[in-house]
């Protein structure tokens, strides 16, 4: 094989192991000498979506069987850490002043067994001054909404206009269109749910931190872990065993992983942590979560000439990768596979009192496709025209040389009309028994 994998047959090398003896994941590191005598960490989590923390009582947890230590942010001396994507948003790795979503970690329990830690976590009691909670972007943006991050001055934490990209021009954009259709869609929030939940293990050896993580991006975990432990990155070694799925949600490092080295240095023992499936549902980053305001216009014979999308990205309760990456990728894919000559696309990211969103399977591109495909259906409905025929009239014509869309995305090859024709051939026999709809994903 040459220097590129493009056009080459690439054989998977990992399958024989997984199909025979099986993989070796973080939880399988039972014979690792550095982890001999490791204790287990469990995190107590917030039970309210938004509130000021008045006090955290860990006394009962500390007295339970098998519990070695219990730590809050104050016990560990944790300082606020700014978001990489908006430095005005800060948080401590264990919530200290307020909680912002159900499942946010507020205390860490170190125990002899995992089960002892889970029992102890149930007894940690936090007293909250409960604040209004927002679970959707529209309520979080409403006038007078309580700020989730006071220093940000707004629950809107990112907008493509700050990059110099133009605002949408509203109804003026559609002057001259014979037909205009509008819609508001929700691209529903999803939980990634990899077969292997998050897990990590740490050991300090001769002043150097060795950390095993179930991650898709070991390099991205290095800086935050080194920073939290106050050491040079050269003193941290990140090891990634087999990873049982991630889908984008295991990119980077989470507070539960970053804290392990800090806690290990306090107790003087290696540590293991693995979340439960229930924890994974509320604390592993979520995906999608866009509200999409679409307007589409064109001629009465079915030609789309103008398309406008304003995507409101739900960032969840932290300004993370989902705040920037998903909307960034929505814009260049907003045209889908259609030759629409005029497109406006703006994205606005909003924090809410929900699990933070991250990069998940396409990160913004499937959302863009869903929006334009729904818009095509709206346009067809407004015209009273067959939805497949509207698509056929607007597909990018067959091309052999690279084609660049009006939003700057270059497609190297394509014959989308042929694909549509073939799909119609396969579905024609089902028409009498089933409703048929179409969508094109590139």
Report residues per predicted region.
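A structural signal for short hydrophobic beta-strand segments in well-ordered beta-sheet cores
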Residues: 99, 202, 263, 296-297
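Glycine-rich loop/linker segments at domain edges
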Residues: 8, 13-20, 155-200, 289-375
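Alpha-helical support elements that line or immediately flank enzyme active sites
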Residues: 43-71, 108-128, 200-267, 324-333, ...
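Beta-strand segments within the central parallel beta-sheet cores of soluble alpha/beta enzyme folds
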Residues: 73, 235-241, 268-278, 305-310, ...
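Flexible, low-hydrophobicity surface segments
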Residues: 1-155, 183
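Single conserved hydrophobic/aromatic residue that forms the stacking wall/gate
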Residues: 425-442
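Short, surface-exposed loop/turn segments at secondary-structure boundaries that line and modulate
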Residues: 71-104, 138-150, 220, 238-259, ...
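Short, glycine-/Ser/Thr-/acidic-enriched flexible segments
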Residues: 24, 48-50, 75-77, 106, ...
């Amino acid at each position: 094989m040459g220097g590129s994998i493009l056009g080459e047959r690439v054989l998977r090398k990992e399958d024989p192991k997984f199909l025979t003896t099986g993989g070796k994941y973080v939880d399988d590191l039972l014979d690792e000498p550095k982890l001999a005598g490791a204790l287990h960490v469990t995190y107590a989590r917030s039970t309210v979506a938004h509130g000021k923390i008045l006090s955290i009582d860990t006394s009962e947890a500390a007295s339970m069987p098998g519990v070695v230590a219990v730590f809050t942010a104050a016990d560990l001396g944790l300082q606020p850490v700014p978001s990489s994507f908006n430095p005005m948003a800060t948080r401590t790795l264990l919530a200290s002043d307020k909680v912002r979503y159900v499942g946010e970690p507020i205390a860490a329990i170190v125990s002899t067994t995992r089960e002892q830690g889970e029992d102890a976590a149930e007894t940690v009691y936090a007293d909250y001054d409960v604040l209004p909670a927002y679970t959707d972007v529209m309520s979080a943006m409403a006038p007078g909404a309580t700020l989730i991050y006071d220093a940000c001055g707004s629950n809107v934490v990112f907008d493509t206009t700050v990059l110099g990209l133009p605002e949408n021009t509203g109804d003026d954009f559609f002057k001259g269109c014979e037909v205009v259709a509008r819609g508001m869609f929700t691209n529903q929030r999803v939980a990634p749910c990899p077969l292997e939940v998050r897990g990590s293990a740490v050991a300090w050896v001769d002043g150097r931190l060795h950390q095993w993580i179930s991650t898709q991006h070991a390099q991205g975990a290095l800086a935050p872990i080194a920073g939290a432990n106050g050491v040079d990155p050269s003193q941290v070694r990140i090891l990634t065993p087999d990873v049982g799925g991630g889908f984008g949600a295991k990119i980077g490092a989470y507070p539960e992983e970053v804290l392990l080295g800090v806690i290990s240095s306090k107790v003087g023992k290696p540590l293991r942590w693995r979340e439960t499936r229930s924890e994974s549902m509320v604390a592993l980053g979520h995906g999608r979560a866009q509200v999409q305001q679409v307007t589409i216009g064109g001629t009465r014979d079915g030609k789309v000439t103008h398309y406008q999308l304003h995507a409101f990205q739900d960032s969840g309760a932290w300004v993370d990768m989902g705040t920037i990456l998903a909307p960034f990728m929505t814009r260049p894919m907003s045209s889908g596979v259609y030759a629409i000559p005029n497109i406006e696309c703006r994205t606005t990211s909003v924090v809410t009192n929900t699990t933070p969103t991250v990069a998940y399977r396409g990160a913004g591109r499937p959302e863009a496709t869903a929006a334009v495909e729904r818009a095509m259906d709206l346009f067809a409905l407004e015209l009273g025209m067959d939805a497949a025929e509207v698509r056929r009239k607007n597909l990018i014509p067959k091309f052999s040389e690279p084609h660049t869309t009006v939003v700057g995305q270059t497609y190297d090859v394509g014959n989308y009309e042929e694909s549509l024709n073939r799909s119609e051939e396969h579905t024609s026999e089902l028409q009498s028994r089933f409703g048929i709809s179409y969508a094109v994903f590139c």
